[in-house]
């Protein structure tokens, strides 16, 4: 028998389930595009360094340690969250630079060829429906 209607489970604190408070102390100031690009670049570089350091720590970490699996799982979770956030920030950065979205050109282009099928006859059935007969190839 289930108690309550709320599912207990992975309740990690995120900005979606934790309140965020912003206190305005000054009048709003406009920021130039160059300042935004500088901030984004430094923020992305800092977070990529964190990802690199956590992956290097898990690779070269203590394998004999009993908590190695828990540490690896935590760093994997951090890595997944950061990498998805960084990809979104890189899209914003490209948008501020006025560049088109990044595309993966490593795959071979797909060529689609179409062939025309010729109808042989269109008839009306006794119940009023349309019957189309196609030529067999």
Curated annotation (Swiss-Prot):
Keywords: DNA-directed RNA polymerase, Nucleus, Phosphoprotein, Ribosome biogenesis, Transcription. Residues 100-137 are annotated as: Disordered. It is found in: Nucleus, Nucleolus. GO terms for molecular function: DNA-directed RNA polymerase activity. The keyword Nucleus applies. The modification Phosphoserine is found at residue 121. The N-terminus is blocked. GO terms for cellular component: nucleus; RNA polymerase I complex. The keyword Ligase does not apply. One of its GO terms (biological process) is termination of RNA polymerase I transcription. Its main location: nucleus. DNA-dependent RNA polymerases catalyze the transcription of DNA into RNA using the four ribonucleoside triphosphates as substrates. Component of RNA polymerase I (Pol I) which synthesizes ribosomal RNA precursors. RPA14 seems to play a role in the stability of subunits RPO26 and RPA43. In vitro, the RPA14-RPA43 subcomplex binds single-stranded RNA. Present with 3100 molecules/cell in log phase SD medium. Component of the RNA polymerase I (Pol I) complex consisting of 14 subunits: RPA135, RPA190, RPC40, RPA14, RPB5, RPO26, RPA43, RPB8, RPA12, RPB10, RPC19, RPC10, RPA49 and RPA34. The complex is composed of a horseshoe-shaped core containing ten subunits (RPA135, RPA190, RPB5, RPO26, RPB8, RPB10, RPC10, RPA12, RPC19 and RPC40) where RPA135 and RPA190 form the DNA-binding cleft. Outside of the core, RPA14 and RPA43 form the stalk that mediates interactions with transcription initiation factors and newly synthesized RNA. This is DNA-directed RNA polymerase I subunit RPA14.
């Amino acid at each position: 028998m289930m108690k309550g209607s709320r599912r207990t489970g992975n309740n990690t604190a995120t900005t979606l389930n934790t309140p965020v408070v912003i206190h305005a102390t000054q009048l709003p100031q406009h920021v130039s595009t160059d300042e935004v690009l500088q901030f984004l670049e430094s923020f992305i570089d800092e977070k990529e360094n964190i990802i690199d350091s956590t992956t290097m720590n898990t690779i070269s970490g203590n394998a004999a340690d009993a908590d190695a699996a828990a540490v690896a799982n935590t760093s994997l979770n951090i890595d997944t969250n950061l990498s998805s956030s960084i990809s979104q920030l890189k899209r914003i950065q490209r948008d501020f630079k006025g560049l088109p979205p990044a595309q993966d050109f490593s795959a071979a282009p797909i060529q689609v060829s179409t062939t025309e099928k010729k109808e042989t006859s269109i008839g009306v059935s006794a119940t009023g429906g349309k019957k189309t007969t196609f030529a067999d190839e």
